[in-house]
A protein has these predicted regions:
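Short, hydrophobic beta-strand segments that form beta-sheet elements in well-ordered domains
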Residues: 18, 136-138
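Residue-level marker of positions within ordered structural domains that often coincide
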Residues: 51, 142, 196
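Short, flexible active-site loop motifs that bind/organize anionic cofactors or intermediates
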Residues: 80, 138, 205
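Active-site glycine- and acidic-residue-rich loops that bind
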Residues: 23-28, 138-145
Length: 216
């Protein structure tokens, strides 16, 4: 890839970490830039793998356990979004990450997607161990309160997208989720209080990479 080529030429001046999307190929995991000790080579390393398990709440493609407040055009009132993968494929990818001891990031916006991720992580831990897996929920905007202790128990991290509400908060309240779900988006305080390691992000280019807005 272009970053590997730049690293090969010594053209990188800051440390960069990338994660390879599992269903798009795993060549990066056999690269010299992936090492078990997480060391950088020429300011670059491959950190692990990523899965995208659902879509976005603002686009009404996040996978929810309860229907959207207002379904998108062409969908009935029972519409809850949808998963990206079959159950078999989701389980296969998560097991593969644990079997190889690759750190796994999972784009999981909806609470149904979070349920799926946690379920298969629990199974992978039973099958392969890897207690220090440090798997990460990416976004986790519609995490339910009852999921938080499970996240903590499984040693899963959460990278929250709290700045999202600055741009789409009204849309979530009035069309996507309604109250009370929209008022519990990205429950960062509850995650921290449960002892879960939390980060925050901009998801650039979805929103601008404004570090102050992320922590505002």
């Amino acid at each position: 890839n272009s970053l590997e080529k730049a690293a090969d030429k010594g053209e990188l001046y800051i440390d960069l970490v990338t994660y390879t999307v599992m269903d798009m190929g795993l060549d990066a995991m056999s690269s010299k830039y992936y090492t078990k000790d997480h060391s950088y080579l020429n300011h670059y390393r491959v950190g692990g793998v990523k899965l995208v398990l659902d879509g976005s709440p603002q686009g009404k493609t996040a996978w929810l356990t309860k229907p959207y407040l207002e379904p998108p055009s062409g969908k009935d009132d029972s519409y809850r979004g949808y998963p990206k993968f079959s159950k078999e494929d989701a389980e296969k990818f998560i097991n593969q990450a644990f079997q190889n001891q690759w750190q796994l990031l999972a784009h999981t916006n909806g609470d149904a997607a979070v349920d799926e991720f946690l379920f298969y992580i629990n199974g992978a831990l039973e099958n392969y161990g890897y207690d220090e897996h440090r798997s990460v929920i990416i976004h986790g905007q519609v995490i339910r309160k009852d999921q938080i202790q499970k996240i903590a128990d499984l040693n899963v991290l959460a990278s929250e997208y709290a700045a999202h509400t600055f741009y789409w908060g009204d849309w979530h309240l009035n069309s996507v989720l309604g109250s009370p779900r929209a008022e519990y988006i990205s429950p960062t305080r509850d995650l921290i209080d449960a002892g879960i390691n939390v980060t925050s992000h901009s998801d650039c280019p979805v929103i601008p990479p404004n570090s102050l807005r992320i922590i505002d």
